[in-house]
Amino acid sequence: MPDPDLLRVGDVYYMVSTTMFYMPGAPILRSKDLYHWEIVSYIFERIEDNEIYRLENGKNAYGKGQWATSLAAYRDRFYACFVCHDMGKTFIYSTDDIEKSGWEKTEINRVFHDMSFLFWKGKPYLVYGNGTIGITELKEDLSGLEENGLDQTLLITPSDMRLRCEGCRALVKDGWLYLLFIEWPKDGCRREVCYRANSLEGPFERKVLMEDDGGLPGRGVAQGTLVESAAGEWYAVLFQDRGASGRIPYLMQARWEDGWPVLGENGRLPEHLALPFEPYPAQPVVSSDSFCHDENRLMKVWQWNHNPDDACWSFTSHPGWLSLEAKDASGLLTARNTLTQRTMEPGCRCEVILSVSEMREGDYAGLCALQGRYGQIGVKICDGKRYVLAVQKTRDGGLVKTAEPLEEDTIQLRIDFDYRNQIDLATFYFRTKETEWKQVGEALEMVFTLDLFVGYRIGIFHYHEKMGEEKVVPECTDRKREPGQKGRAAFRNFTIRPL
């Protein structure tokens, strides 16, 4: 849950996070205790319907898409703003109901990197940038940029950094403007810094608010916002890089001292945090799913890798199963209709039942550990025969494949994700009615890489792929499928539970 931004309505807190190229995107989470969160809506079903988001012609939005959304309540309406670098646009979405998916969209043909809404003396602005921080005035109704409005550099932050200030979150308190940023000095960990001024003209004062990695060298807790409870207590929600599992939110107490926010225990991470709220019975952000649904609607824990082809998946065509029709792909990262959800620390076990009876020549279906260096376990059809196939992408970009014959129509697949002590290993298994669990291939060394820029997810996939030069087994001849053949894989009883 990276890049958090929060607001409070009465005694309910709402948080937005970044999901980049996963669809639907920009989840809105709800809580009453700041600790237990549940997904209640998504800002958009699709950012755009183009080649990039359909994974066509070698194009994709990996590492791009929706970034660092700012969330605000303004004049009885909710607003969200984020940039898409792949399209060179900034989007402002709005709604009357924050718990309803599919907000109204406004496009701005300009990039405002890591922006934050700012409402200062009756006017709305965007504050944005990396290192050099700019400010641009919006129209009164936030429908676009104000013609001849303020549009200038607001301040320039130190340049002798591994990462200069970015990830802005702006707030106003007692006549002062506060700008929160993440930065990364060359000789330390990522940290949270604050600039303040009582005028847009400055001068701006600066203070480091949090510089603590919690024992994970270099992985300082930073980038996020402050929120005030209904009782007047303050809290900070930042995030931390946790290796292969991705980025997780970090909650801590905050207070105000001499006009500055003080985070945690005087700028250090607290070991414990007592919250003065009744525990909120939230639905988990990861969940098992029987796939027994009366309509073609996903549980909110699920997201597709890029835009799905809605004609190629169904719960209702084979009741009790998730049916995925195979589309052509060169591999996992070009395959459409891969259905994903988050994994969880310190580790989790994911299982699913796969029916292969309607798969066709060249089809490959199963479970995956999805990131740039991915791993797969599933069933491949080759020369009319079935093989249990494990695939792993290596550090140098190659593929390691392990296969063995399969006779049954139904198979159970499993991936264990182990993040304990940053071991970051995924292990792949299968079993049939006649066999016990059997590991296939070596454990995958999971690595958070910047090509996808997200933590590992569990994924359910099915696509049609040519063998190419690396065949599953030497006897495979890459036989062509019959024209018009459409293979289907069916999945049921997906489970996810702690290791």
What does each of the following model-derived ranges do?
Residues M1-L499:
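Carbohydrate-active catalytic/glycan-binding domains of CAZyme proteins
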